[in-house]
């Protein structure tokens, strides 16, 4: 038997030399939390991660860090928006997330560890039969979320008494490059912005380094903002 054919058969037996890990879908918790807290969803046995958004000047604009249990629940989740001087640090405690500093109950959970309610803001979340958060309802607004067949978030629509804001994302056709996407933002029927992201990936098809371009079309001429995202993904 010729060596090239032998190597080909060995690769087939070993499930692919260049594709050592099969793709996993995004869990309901990962997809829903990424939607609500604005970070890139990950798949596979992630146990510890960070995502750092950096401006063209090399300054940190936003950072998200988290740890996950074997069951895929977020044990901790910390978010810092340095551009707007806001932040949040949550720690899991039974059916709630508490503020990591004050220990005040912040987020109520349902099921295994899915979002249920944010009592202080009067917000409740609803899930579909697969456990994905599909809507959030508050006193003066409602948000509807969309996903593809793998659980990848495809955007959301926010409706209030004044207008309707929609974000529609289109990921790459390559299933291993879901975080290569374009997205369009609209207020009512008027396009106000677009986003393009491209990434390098690890063997779990999770992003490692990304380039993000945000275009603000609400002003004339439109203004582009360029960012890089540094990702750290640790697995069990």
Q: Which role does the model predict for each range below?
A:
Residues 17-236:
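Buried hydrophobic residues that stabilize the cores of well-folded domains
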């Amino acid at each position: 038997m010729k060596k090239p054919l032998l190597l080909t058969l060995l690769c087939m037996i070993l499930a692919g030399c260049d594709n050592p890990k099969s793709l996993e879908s995004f869990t309901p918790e990962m997809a829903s939390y990424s939607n609500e807290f604005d970070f890139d969803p990950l798949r596979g046995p992630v146990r510890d991660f960070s995502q750092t958004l950096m401006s063209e000047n090399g300054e940190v604009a936003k950072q998200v860090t988290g740890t996950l249990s074997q069951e895929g629940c977020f044990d901790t989740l910390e978010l810092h928006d340095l551009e707007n001087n806001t932040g949040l640090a949550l720690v899991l405690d039974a059916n709630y997330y508490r503020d990591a500093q004050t220990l005040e109950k912040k987020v109520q959970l349902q099921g295994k560890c899915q979002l249920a309610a944010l009592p202080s803001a009067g917000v409740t979340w609803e899930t579909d039969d697969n456990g994905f958060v599909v809507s959030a309802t508050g006193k003066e607004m409602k948000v509807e979320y969309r996903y593809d067949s793998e659980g990848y978030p495809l955007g959301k629509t926010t409706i209030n008494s004044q207008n309707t804001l929609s974000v529609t994302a289109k990921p790459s056709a390559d299933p291993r490059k879901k975080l290569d996407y374009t997205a369009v933002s609209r207020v009512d029927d008027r396009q106000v912005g677009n986003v393009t992201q491209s990434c390098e990936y690890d063997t779990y098809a999770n992003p490692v380094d990304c380039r993000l371009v945000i275009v603000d079309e609400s002003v004339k001429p439109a203004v582009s903002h360029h960012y890089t995202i540094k990702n750290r993904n640790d697995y069990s």
